[in-house]
């Protein structure tokens, strides 16, 4: 009789652990991206949102990665990095605007493809455009 009671207790504990882990996994994966627009005299929230969409698309194309947060790096850095953005592109037309975001995202749970398994990455994203045109993602990675 004691053996059945012990087995039931073990099954109940194992089930509770599995449900807890599954709940945490679901919460992490459905948690919305936190966006900090900061203060800008250069860009509207709409300008930033269109740039953010490109960043989200890039993260989502990296199978298994989960974006947690994006923060506008500020007007000073964005203005300062315009020359850097222009140095990266082989376009006939120079960019007139640059916007920089900081991010935090998690790599795939099991890693692979150059990722460390289930690790947080803190990358910068550089986007540029010409005369209020569409943003182009020109650089990303560690600062």
Residue ranges and their predicted role:
Residues 120-143:
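Short beta-strand edge/turn micro-motifs at domain boundaries
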Residues 2-119:
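Flexible low-complexity loop/turn motifs enriched in small/helix-breaking residues
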């Amino acid at each position: 009789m004691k053996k059945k009671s012990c087995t039931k207790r073990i099954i109940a504990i194992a089930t509770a652990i599995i449900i807890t882990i599954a709940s945490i996994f679901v919460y992490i994966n459905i948690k919305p991206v936190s966006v900090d627009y900061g203060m800008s005299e250069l860009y509207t929230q709409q300008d930033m949102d269109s740039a953010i969409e490109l960043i989200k698309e890039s993260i989502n194309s990296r199978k298994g990665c989960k974006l947690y947060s994006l923060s506008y790096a500020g007007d000073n850095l964005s203005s300062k990095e315009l020359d850097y953005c222009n140095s990266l592109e082989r376009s006939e037309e120079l960019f007139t605007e640059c916007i920089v975001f900081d991010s935090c995202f998690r790599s795939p749970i099991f890693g692979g493809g150059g990722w460390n398994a289930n690790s947080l990455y803190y990358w910068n994203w550089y986007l540029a455009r010409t005369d209020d045109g569409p943003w182009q993602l020109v650089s990303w990675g560690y600062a």
